[in-house]
Regions:
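Phosphate/ATP-binding catalytic cores across multiple sugar-kinase/actin-like superfamilies
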Residues: 23-47, 144-155, 209, 213, ...
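Glycine-rich phosphate-binding loop plus the immediately following alpha-helix
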Residues: 1-2, 7-13, 84-87, 93-97, ...
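Gly/Thr-rich phosphate-binding beta-strand-loop-beta motif of the actin/hexokinase/Hsp70
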Residues: 2, 154-188, 263-283, 460-464, ...
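Flexible inter-domain linker/hinge segments
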Residues: 98-168, 172, 428-520
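A mobile "lid/hinge" subdomain adjacent to the ATP/sugar-phosphate binding pocket shared
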Residues: 1-21, 32, 319-352
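Glycine-rich phosphate-binding loops at beta-strand->alpha-helix junctions
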Residues: 30, 40-69, 80-84, 231-232, ...
Length: 520
């Protein structure tokens, strides 16, 4: 499949607790399968086979997978030394054979001098440039004043105090966010970090850091309720025994309406997805998501910046300093990679390309996702949020593309966590109104210190003919989370011979048979 689609598949798998090792080897098999199918197109690949190029040089597992799929032995495999530069070596060798009858125009000093001015000349000849983000320093200063960001650190609580709070957890596609919300709906503390493919490990670190920090402050935390949302909503809810959980669209809409009660349009751009939510008179009237492809989302610009060694916090500053921003349009990410390579070849500087990518994200939203031609339909109060809008260059690109001045929260990346904290607060207040003794089911911050889990992939379900291959994540308190099952029976992990288990499966079967068959 397309690499962007594959990445969109991988993120939920990691957030559901599937082992990184399983995802990694599956990725190698996917690359080998696509390469063999695309290049051979049904023709037999006969040994010996030579493997060259960077990925096959530095990833011996990928070579092993290719050998398995091609059915060739070690003796039929050739992996040259320094195979990543084999083509360049061939180019050097060709000078003595293919081009030995042609004059050599290379002159060390003159050629190097020409190379110094090559970028400017090539850039002027080949590419159309976009406009800078600002006309002058004053316009830039006004923009920054218009859209302030909250400080990175939260205020320290009073020593000896006691806080009643609600904990909101947004286990997103690429990042994990936590917020502590007071009873009067003020954000007291938070956590924001990359998942790194280990959402449970990051969650444990976040909870332990919170516990340590408030212990150091001499402040007691009374957590009145916990809610989860995001890609890892179900997994995290099971892990921490959350009181409430819901889909991220609902959480984001609630957070935006809390910030701006008369909001007319909400745009959330995360690491792997986009959400466009239309609101009229406080009621959600339409929701549009990017269908399957994550092209143009936050992880694309992050991946490109990382490849250039650019820290995330420096992206906007670099983009704002671009003198000749690239025009990359709203193409598919895979094709855009080709455009970026062309831009680099034509002499564009990293800041010009970064600026072009920031603009392409917004173009992609309006041309490929929400497909709005008349911008008046967005209404007068537009809220933009999500981790991608922490990037001022993306926010400025939105302003320039739409001609609107949107409302960006001071903490745009934490809006999902804020939304679920608000919803959890309302849920728990409703429960306590019915029963004043109602308590949270949260495991507690102290239990988080000893929190552990065990992944067991490839667990075959025996309760029907589907024989689903499940991954069972078992937590330290004995509870478990199951993924890979196609029906409720797959969630049963107890001994199949136990009478109670048989009774449970029979009840599930009864409920499933009670559902009308609409096909017959």
């Amino acid at each position: 499949r397309c690499g962007v689609f594959a990445k969109t598949d991988i993120q939920p798998m990691l957030n559901q607790g599937i082992a990184i090792e399983d995802v990694a080897i599956s990725s190698c098999h996917a690359v080998a399968q696509q390469t063999i199918g695309g290049l051979a197109q049904g023709m037999e690949i006969k040994p010996p086979v030579i493997f060259e190029g960077g990925p096959l040089t530095f990833n011996p597992t990928l070579v092993r997978v290719f050998k398995e799929r091609l059915g060739i032995s070690e003796e039929q495999t050739i992996v040259p030394e320094r195979s990543e530069v084999l083509v360049a070596w061939g180019a050097a060798l060709s000078l003595g054979s293919m081009f030995n009858d042609k004059p050599c125009d290379y002159r060390e000093e003159g050629s190097l001098e020409a190379l110094r001015h090559f970028n400017e000349k090539r850039q002027a000849e080949h590419r159309e440039n976009g406009n800078p983000f600002f006309k002058d320093a004053n316009e830039r200063e006004e923009f920054l004043k218009r859209h302030p960001m909250a400080p990175a650190f939260y205020p320290q609580p009073t020593s000896g105090s006691e806080l009643n709070v609600y904990l909101g957890i947004d286990a997103g596609s690429t990042t994990t966010k936590l917020v502590l919300m007071s009873e009067d709906e003020q954000i007291l503390d938070g956590f924001y970090a990359s998942n790194d493919g280990e959402p449970l490990a990051v969650l444990k670190r976040a909870l332990v850091e919170l516990a340590d920090r408030y212990e150091e402050f001499g402040c007691k935390l009374n957590i009145l309720g916990v809610g989860t949302t995001g890609y890892g909503e179900q997994l995290i809810a099971k892990a921490v025994h959350a009181d409430y959980h819901t889909v991220e669209t609902v959480a984001h809409a609630n957070a935006a309406q809390h910030l701006c009660p008369d909001v007319s349009f909400i745009l959330d751009i995360g690491g792997q997805d986009m959400k466009a939510i239309s609101v009229q008179d406080g009621i959600v009237t339409g929701i549009i998501l990017n269908e399957a492809c994550s092209s143009g989302c936050g992880s694309f610009i992050e991946t490109y910046a990382r490849s250039l060694g650019i820290p995330m916090e420096k992206i906007a500053e670099l983009a704002f300093n671009a003198k000749n921003p690239s025009k990359l349009g709203s193409r598919c990410t895979v094709f855009m990679n080709s455009s970026i390579i062309t831009e680099q070849r034509d002499g564009k500087q990293p800041e010009d390309i970064i600026a072009g990518i920031c603009r392409s994200i917004i173009e992609n939203v309006f041309t490929k996702v929400i497909r709005i031609r008349n911008l008046d339909t967005l209404g007068k109060k537009v809220v933009v949020q999500g981790g991608t809008f922490k990037n001022n260059a993306v926010l400025r690109a939105f302003e320039q593309h739409t001609g609107l001045t949107p409302i960006r929260p001071e903490r745009p990346g934490e809006m999902g966590a804020i939304g679920i904290a608000l919803l959890t607060k309302r849920f728990m207040e409703g429960k306590r109104a019915e029963n004043p003794d109602y308590k949270t089911s949260f495991i507690g911050l102290d239990a988080a210190r000893n929190f552990s889990w065990d992944n067991k992939p490839g667990q075959i379900c025996q309760y029907c003919t589907n024989h689903c291959s499940r991954t069972i994540v078992t937590f330290s308190d004995g509870t478990s989370y199951v993924t890979g099952n196609r029906c409720e029976r797959g969630e049963v992990t107890a001994d199949p011979n136990d009478p109670e288990t048989k009774k449970l499966v029979a009840e599930i079967n009864r409920k499933m048979l009670a559902v009308p068959d609409m096909i017959k």
